UniProtKB/Swiss-Prot annotation:
Site (Transition state stabilizer): H38, T137
Protein name (database record): 2-C-methyl-D-erythritol 2,4-cyclodiphosphate synthase
Record carries keyword Nucleotidyltransferase: no
Documented EC number(s): 4.6.1.12
Catalytic activity: 4-CDP-2-C-methyl-D-erythritol 2-phosphate = 2-C-methyl-D-erythritol 2,4-cyclic diphosphate + CMP
Keyword Lyase in record: yes
Example of a GO MF term: metal ion binding
Source organism per UniProt: Verminephrobacter eiseniae (strain EF01-2)
Residues the record lists as binding 4-CDP-2-C-methyl-D-erythritol 2-phosphate: D10, V11, H12, H38, S39, D60, I61, G62, F65, P66, D67, T68, D69
Coiled coil: none
Role according to the record: Involved in the biosynthesis of isopentenyl diphosphate (IPP) and dimethylallyl diphosphate (DMAPP), two major building blocks of isoprenoid compounds. Catalyzes the conversion of 4-diphosphocytidyl-2-C-methyl-D-erythritol 2-phosphate (CDP-ME2P) to 2-C-methyl-D-erythritol 2,4-cyclodiphosphate (ME-CPP) with a corresponding release of cytidine 5-monophosphate (CMP).
UniProt binding sites for a divalent metal cation: D10, H12, H46
GO biological process per UniProt: isopentenyl diphosphate biosynthetic process, methylerythritol 4-phosphate pathway; terpenoid biosynthetic process
Pathway membership: Isoprenoid biosynthesis; isopentenyl diphosphate biosynthesis via DXP pathway; isopentenyl diphosphate from 1-deoxy-D-xylulose 5-phosphate: step 4/6
Length: 183
């Protein structure tokens, strides 16, 4: 069994005049703030996207969906996450599970976690039981604690699709070289 783990992290500044979307769910910030970014700035989905791409050794969100590309301006991060999942599957892996944490002083997120889990599971094409979202505050510390930013972290577990031999192109070359069959 070939298991791989990826880690993702993202942070976006809170500013007036922007929507606040976390985990594919639009929320209201008590101070009327939203997240600044090229896309919809969904900090949680960006962290999960990075974790998945990293687990499959496919780089990061900036490589696949650069903020210099107008095609991704105001993009729905659920679509970016779905495309990242498609690329992970194309590389020969299936998604095992996602564990994630959002760190925000406000708004309170606990009541929104079921909707976030559902939105993430739908974007990934997995069962909701494969997705976990936790919410924490920064206890008033740092930029997150001062309502200047929201941060998210994620871990993704992926496993090779049976029969796909998903060890990645570089590892396949090394394996071939070791077995004497050349690169």
């Amino acid at each position: 069994m070939n298991l791989r783990i990826g880690e993702g992290w993202d942070v976006h500044a809170l500013v007036p005049g922007r929507r606040l979307v976390i985990g594919g769910v639009e929320l209201e910030h008590p101070m009327g703030l939203g997240l600044l970014g090229h896309s919809d700035a969904d900090v949680l989905l960006h962290a999960i996207t990075d974790a998945l791409l990293g687990a499959a050794a496919l780089g990061d969100i900036g490589r696949h969906f650069p903020d210099t590309d107008a095609a991704f301006r105001a993009a729905d991060s659920r679509l970016l996450l779905a495309e990242a999942a498609r690329r992970v599957r194309a590389a020969g892996y299936e998604i095992g599970n996602i564990d994630s944490t959002v760190v925000a002083q406000a708004p309170r997120l606990a009541a929104h976690i079921p909707a976030m889990r559902l939105a993430i599971a739908r974007a990934l094409g997995v069962d909701q039981g494969q997705v976990n979202v936790k919410a924490k505050t920064a206890e008033g510390l740092g930029p997150v604690g001062q309502n200047l930013a929201i941060e998210a972290r994620a871990v993704a577990l992926i496993c090779a699709t049976p029969g796909a031999g998903a060890i990645g192109p570089a590892a396949q070359r090394v394996s071939s070289a070791w077995s004497g069959s050349g690169a």
